């Protein structure tokens, strides 16, 4: 396992230096590496280019934006945008980070070993990307992990949660999904979990009632 971990770290360093530093003539290779490691440590979390540039001691947020663009170009890290009808607002808002491989993110990042929910979320993101969906996240009064858009229509709203047995967790996930579905009337609602399967009916208003499907992630992965 240690040899495999060392191999992955060498592989990442090789990609960073060969495919990014050399190709794009990056002067501060350490800042690029720290950006990649920061992203790996925070998969499924929001990032502000301005705040990260300050954390890394860089002069401006544009540099961090370029770093992430390079990381996406070599398929190491990915960003998704908060959905908004205004493209200008989409570009200005914070993004959410995901990685190309969960094992790689575990090894080069600094994540708590019990934070399995984020890695499940990363698995779902990668599958959505493999299926070539246009992916966003929702943030209104509550948040929803993924929105899928087809043309101009949001077709699916998806939450990812390792377990739904805790009442507070269940309420939070359902509330976030309900908030998303209230914004996008054409969307279907799903919650992907480790092992639960159920159907929940929610009243969004006096006129609208929606059905939410709770599905084990493994079953969803095999569904197409």
Feature annotation, model-predicted:
Residues 2-155, 162:
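Accessory nucleic acid-recognition modules appended to NTPase machines
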Residues 86, 106, 166, 198-199, ...:
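Flexible, glycine-rich phosphate/dinucleotide-binding loops
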Residues 101, 139, 161, 193, ...:
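Residues at the C-termini of beta-strands that transition into short coil/loop
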Residues 103, 107, 176-179, 217-220:
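Generic recognition of well-ordered alpha-helical segments
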Residues 134, 188, 211-213:
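Conserved beta-strand segments of alpha/beta enzyme cores
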Residues 155-156, 188:
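Structural motif
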Residues 162-207:
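Catalytic cores of nucleic-acid endonucleases
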Residues 196-224:
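Domain-level recognition of nuclease-like catalytic cores that cleave nucleotide substrates
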């Amino acid at each position: 396992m240690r040899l495999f971990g060392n191999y992955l770290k060498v592989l990442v360093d090789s990609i960073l230096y060969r495919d990014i530093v050399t190709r794009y003539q990056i002067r501060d290779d350490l800042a690029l590496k720290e950006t990649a490691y920061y992203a790996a440590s925070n998969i499924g979390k929001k990032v502000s280019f301005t705040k990260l540039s300050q954390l890394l001691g860089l002069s401006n947020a544009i540099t961090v934006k370029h770093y992430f663009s390079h990381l996406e170009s070599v398929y190491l890290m990915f960003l998704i945008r908060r959905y908004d009808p205004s493209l200008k607002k989409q570009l200005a808002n914070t993004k959410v980070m995901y990685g190309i491989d969960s094992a790689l993110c575990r090894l080069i990042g600094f994540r708590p070993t019990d934070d399995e929910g984020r890695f499940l979320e990363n698995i779902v993101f990668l599958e959505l990307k493999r299926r070539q969906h246009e992916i966003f996240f929702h943030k209104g009064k509550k948040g929803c992990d993924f929105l899928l858009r087809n043309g101009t229509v949001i077709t699916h709203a998806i939450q990812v949660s390792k377990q739904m047995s805790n009442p507070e967790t269940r309420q939070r996930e359902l509330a976030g999904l309900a908030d998303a579905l209230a914004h996008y009337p054409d969307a279907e609602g799903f919650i992907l979990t480790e092992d639960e399967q159920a159907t929940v009916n929610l009243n969004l208003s006096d006129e609208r009632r929606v059905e939410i499907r709770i599905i084990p992630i493994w079953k969803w992965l095999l569904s197409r």
